[in-house]
């Protein structure tokens, strides 16, 4: 199959296409006008150039096969690769964003959209609480397949170019195990879809030796660490990766992460009933993160088929959060969006096309 045009950065296309200004024109058609056929670009390009594009490149290499909508307005998308028919999922999260008008002091409310993208089909990390690992690991996604998730979701919801998206690499897969394609996708999100790196978050299970590699690329993205435990024994039982990269190893690399002023590293902490949700765990977490500019995002375990874990009470989560906040460690409780359609944190996996998502 021909290379997808979405796999090329603006710089790469500028070097490939002659004259080079055609690359910017092509980017406009691809990312601002959502064109799905090269023939639809004839207003800008000659027939010969259109023929060249059709001969050398593919446009869409994935397609939406199913959409399921939550009562909260979030949507779970099942995508199919047109190359090998493997499937993967992504989620559109709709949230209310409040902002104070500088002139009137009025509170303005608007919708904020976040796309949770997958970077792999399946996952190699094997976290025991995560549904994705039950399908095993299939392959890495190409940058084009990551980009098209956001592009097709934006198109499906009729969102204009100027409507900013947040992108979180919190879907299927470990981003640092597909670092080259993830970094290329981030560059294209920025130059193509006009998504600022500040709106992009990479969440990692803690592949410690690749954190400095990501830092060295100076992408300006936000870093989130899936911590989920305060001692190595518990974390290793939840995340086998901890046997290779233990808590202290991960935290040592996080301490070196370049942070802009007023920015913090996010630590995601999955609360599981009677395992890691006690006040004693909160005290140990406070001690662990001492000296790191950080914030904690608590996630209540989202149940899925075959899981042995239970969801803690909201009261317990609030107790945990209140303690950390009272000690000066910023802590929030993540609202479980799309729980009714199994699109919340840890609930995505590859589906057979015959399966209902």
Curated annotation (Swiss-Prot):
Cofactor annotation remark: Binds 1 [4Fe-4S] cluster. The cluster is coordinated with 3 cysteines and an exchangeable S-adenosyl-L-methionine.
Disulfide-bond pairs as recorded: 116-345
More info: Reaction proceeds by a ping-pong mechanism involving intermediate methylation of a conserved cysteine residue.
Major location (coarse): cytoplasm
Binding-site list for [4Fe-4S] cluster: 123, 127, 130
Catalytic activity reported: adenosine(2503) in 23S rRNA + 2 reduced [2Fe-2S]-[ferredoxin] + 2 S-adenosyl-L-methionine = 2-methyladenosine(2503) in 23S rRNA + 5'-deoxyadenosine + L-methionine + 2 oxidized [2Fe-2S]-[ferredoxin] + S-adenosyl-L-homocysteine; adenosine(37) in tRNA + 2 reduced [2Fe-2S]-[ferredoxin] + 2 S-adenosyl-L-methionine = 2-methyladenosine(37) in tRNA + 5'-deoxyadenosine + L-methionine + 2 oxidized [2Fe-2S]-[ferredoxin] + S-adenosyl-L-homocysteine
Active site residues per record: 89, 345
Family annotation (CDD domains): Radical_SAM (cd01335)
Record protein name field: Dual-specificity RNA methyltransferase RlmN
A molecular-function term among this protein's GO annotations: tRNA binding
GO cellular component: cytoplasm
Described function: Specifically methylates position 2 of adenine 2503 in 23S rRNA and position 2 of adenine 37 in tRNAs. m2A2503 modification seems to play a crucial role in the proofreading step occurring at the peptidyl transferase center and thus would serve to optimize ribosomal fidelity.
Matching Gene3D superfamilies: 1.10.150.530, Aldolase class I
Keywords assigned: 4Fe-4S, Cytoplasm, Disulfide bond, Iron, Iron-sulfur, Metal-binding, Methyltransferase, rRNA processing, S-adenosyl-L-methionine, Transferase, tRNA processing
Native species: Helicobacter pylori (strain ATCC 700392 / 26695)
PROSITE patterns: RADICAL_SAM
Localization of this protein: Cytoplasm
GO biological process: rRNA base methylation; tRNA methylation
EC number(s) recorded for this UniProt protein: 2.1.1.192
Segments forming domain Radical SAM core: 109-340
Similarity annotation: Belongs to the radical SAM superfamily. RlmN family.
InterPro entries: Aldolase_TIM, Methyltransferase_A, RlmN_N, RNA_MTrfase_RlmN, rRNA_lsu_MTrfase_RlmN/Cfr, rSAM
Binding site for S-adenosyl-L-methionine: 173-174, 203, 226-228, 302
Cofactor section: [4Fe-4S] cluster
């Amino acid at each position: 199959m021909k290379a997808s045009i979405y796999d090329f950065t603006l710089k790469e296309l500028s070097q490939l296409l002659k004259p080079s200004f055609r690359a910017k024109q092509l980017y406009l058609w691809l990312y601002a006008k959502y064109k799905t056929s090269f023939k639809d670009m004839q207003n800008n390009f000659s027939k010969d150039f259109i023929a060249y594009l059709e001969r050398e490149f593919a446009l869409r290499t994935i397609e939406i096969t199913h959409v399921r909508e939550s009562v909260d307005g979030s949507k779970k998308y099942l995508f199919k690769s047109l190359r090998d028919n493997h499937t993967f999922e992504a989620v559109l999260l709709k949230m209310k964003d409040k902002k104070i008008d500088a002139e009137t002091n009025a509170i303005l409310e608007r919708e904020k959209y976040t796309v949770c993208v997958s970077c792999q089909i399946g996952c190699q990390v094997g976290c025991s609480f995560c549904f994705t690992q039950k399908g095993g690991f299939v392959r890495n996604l190409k940058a084009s397949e990551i980009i098209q998730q956001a592009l097709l979701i934006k198109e499906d919801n009729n969102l204009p170019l100027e409507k900013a998206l947040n992108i979180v690499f919190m879907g299927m897969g470990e981003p640092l195990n597909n670092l080259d394609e993830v970094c290329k996708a981030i560059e294209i999100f920025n130059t193509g879809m006009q998504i600022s790196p500040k709106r992009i978050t990479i969440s990692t299970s803690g592949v410690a030796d690749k954190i400095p590699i990501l830092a060295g690329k100076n992408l300006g993205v936000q870093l989130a660490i899936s911590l989920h435990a305060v001692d190595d024994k518990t974390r290793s039982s939840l995340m086998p990766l901890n046997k290779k990269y233990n808590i202290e190893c991960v935290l040592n690399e996080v301490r070196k992460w370049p942070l802009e002023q007023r920015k913090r590293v996010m630590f995601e902490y999955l609360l599981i009933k009677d395992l890691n949700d006690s006040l004693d765990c909160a005290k140990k977490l406070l001690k662990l993160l001492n000296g790191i500019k950080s914030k904690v995002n608590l996630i209540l375990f989202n149940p899925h088929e075959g899981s042995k874990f239970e969801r803690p009470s909201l009261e317990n989560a609030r107790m945990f959060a209140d303690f950390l906040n009272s000690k000066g460690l910023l802590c929030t409780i993540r609202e479980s969006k799309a729980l009714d359609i199994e699109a919340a944190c840890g609930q995505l996996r590859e589906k057979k096309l015959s399966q209902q998502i």
